[in-house]
Amino acid sequence: MTENRRIKKVNSLLREAIANVILKDVKHPKISNQWITVTRVCLSKDLHSARVYVSIMPHENTSAETLDALKASAGFIAYKASKGVVLKYFPEIHFYIEDIFSPQDHIENLLWKIREQDKN
């Protein structure tokens, strides 16, 4: 139980630290001009690997291009984030897209169809 609580706490700290690094320190053109939100971090039980889920609102690049740039910058992001979160071993980070807008779009489409049916 204590280990589970510790992992949740470290997940929260990592999410905040990684988000700050992406916002303030990463100068990659495919990252710095995008709206990127770190939605959650899932740390492995051995604390050596972390899956970082991001939501990307494309502006100049596609989400896939931005995700590739994040993956390429993962080492730098981990290095900078490790300065803010002190752990014996800083986890290797892996980025994944979490499409939080897709369910919202689906619901809006359903509501629009219902409104259209009510008009007829």
Swiss-Prot record:
> In terms of domain of life, where is this protein from?
Bacteria
**Protein's cellular compartments:** Cytoplasm
Chief subcellular location equals cytoplasm
Q: What InterPro entries is this protein classified in?
A: KH_dom-like_a/b, RbfA, RbfA_dom_sf
Keywords, A to Z, come to: Cytoplasm, Ribosome biogenesis
**UniProt keyword Cytoplasm, yes or no:** yes
- GO terms classed as biological process: maturation of SSU-rRNA
Q: Which Gene Ontology terms of cellular component type are present?
A: cytosol
Q: Name one Pfam family in it.
A: RBFA
Q: Which GO terms describe its molecular function?
A: ribosomal small subunit binding
What the entry lists under PANTHER family is as follows: RIBOSOME-BINDING FACTOR A, CHLOROPLASTIC-RELATED
The record's family statement is: Belongs to the RbfA family.
The record describes its quaternary structure and partners as: Monomer. Binds 30S ribosomal subunits, but not 50S ribosomal subunits or 70S ribosomes.
User: What does the UniProt function comment say about this protein?
Assistant: One of several proteins that assist in the late maturation steps of the functional core of the 30S ribosomal subunit. Associates with free 30S ribosomal subunits (but not with 30S subunits that are part of 70S ribosomes or polysomes). Required for efficient processing of 16S rRNA. May interact with the 5'-terminal helix region of 16S rRNA.
What protein name does the entry list?
Ribosome-binding factor A
Which organism was this protein described from?
A: Chlamydia caviae (strain ATCC VR-813 / DSM 19441 / 03DC25 / GPIC) (Chlamydophila caviae)
Gene expressing this chain: rbfA
